[in-house]
Regions:
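Alpha-helix-loop-beta-strand connector modules within alpha/beta enzyme cores
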Residues: 36-43, 47-48, 96-121, 143-144, ...
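Catalytic cores of alpha/beta
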Residues: 123-135, 170-182, 218-241
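An N-cap/entry alpha-helix motif that binds or orients negatively charged groups
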Residues: 2-67
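Catalytic-face loop-and-helix region of soluble metabolic enzyme cores
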Residues: 185-241
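Glycine/Thr-rich beta-alpha phosphate-binding loop at enzyme active sites
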Residues: 58-69, 78-97, 179-207
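Glycine-enriched alpha-helix->loop->beta-strand junction motifs that scaffold or abut catalytic
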Residues: 83-84, 108-112, 133-139, 159-163, ...
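Glycine-rich phosphate-binding active-site loops on the catalytic face of alpha/beta enzymes
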Residues: 133-150, 188-196, 234-251
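Active-site mouth loops of central-metabolism enzymes
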Residues: 53-71, 114-123, 164-169, 217-222
Length: 251
């Protein structure tokens, strides 16, 4: 039986073929020429305290609906007003996300100079051009769903389009792949994408293996101040938090 991740990737491939037919890549390339240079995502994550990447997320494959009354603009405004260093937007349909959510969020963040990360399952160059036209300042690449050749190629294209890349890893082997590919921002996912179980010890185990000149982001399984202190002690510069915020009664 296919894993959750395998089912997601199969569905994404089908969706992408439809999208490519509807909007040819040449059309997107023409629109990119007149766009402004994206904001500095990695620069927003440095400081004397741990930084928050707050996630705009309606649902998750593991827990289902997180917010019944979901407004990406209102939610991102709340995040910005409360000191988020960056905003992450889920654009994948499995999270009840949509690319339009990111464009909507940019209407709030552009004036405040807060960068926006596109979080999706990206594996094709077309998706990077799409990411740029949506206005994202950074995007996620997940090592476990890419070959090393794919990872390097997608990172090079993103760099050419001025998009910074958060490269997500879950174990030592994936971390080596990310570093070998030249990743500057490493996302340590505390969630195992095969089982969807979380454990903060993943950040504690992998963080010491990352060179000091890299930006470390701890992702998933972060619910309270104690968790923040734990990952900060491990060496994380930023925490990406979604479910704990979107499922809270008072964000």
């Amino acid at each position: 039986m296919p894993t959750i991740l395998e089912r997601i990737m199969l569905a994404k491939q089908k969706e992408l073929e439809i999208q490519k037919s509807a909007v040819p890549i040449a059309t997107i390339e023409d629109q990119i020429r007149d766009m402004e240079i994206p904001l500095n995502f990695s620069g927003a994550l440095f400081g004397d305290r741990i930084r928050l990447i707050a996630e705009v997320k309606k649902a998750s494959p593991s827990k289902g609906l997180l917010m019944a009354e979901f407004d990406p603009v209102d939610l991102s405004k709340t995040y910005v007003d409360n000191g988020a260093a960056a905003i992450s937007v889920l654009t994948d349909s499995r999270f009840q996300g949509h690319p339009s959510h990111l464009k909507s969020v940019k209407t709030i963040t552009s004036s405040t100079r807060i960068p926006v990360l596109r979080k999706d399952f990206i594996f094709d160059p077309y998706q990077i051009y799409e990411t740029r036209i949506l206005g994202a300042d950074a995007m996620l690449l997940i090592v476990s769903v890419l070959s090393q050749k794919q990872l390097i190629g997608l990172m090079e294209l993103a760099r050419a389009l001025w998009i910074q890349v958060l490269v997500e890893v879950h174990n030592e082997e994936e971390l080596k792949q990310a570093l070998d590919a030249g990743a500057e921002i490493i996302g340590i996912n505390n969630r195992d994408l095969q089982t969807f179980e979380t454990n903060l010890s993943t950040t504690e185990r992998l963080s010491p293996l990352i060179p000091e000149n890299k930006v470390i982001v701890s992702e998933s399984g972060i619910h309270n101040r104690k968790d923040i202190q734990r990952i900060m002690k491990a060496g994380a510069h930023a925490a990406l938090i979604g479910e704990a915020l979107t499922s809270a009664h008072d964000v």
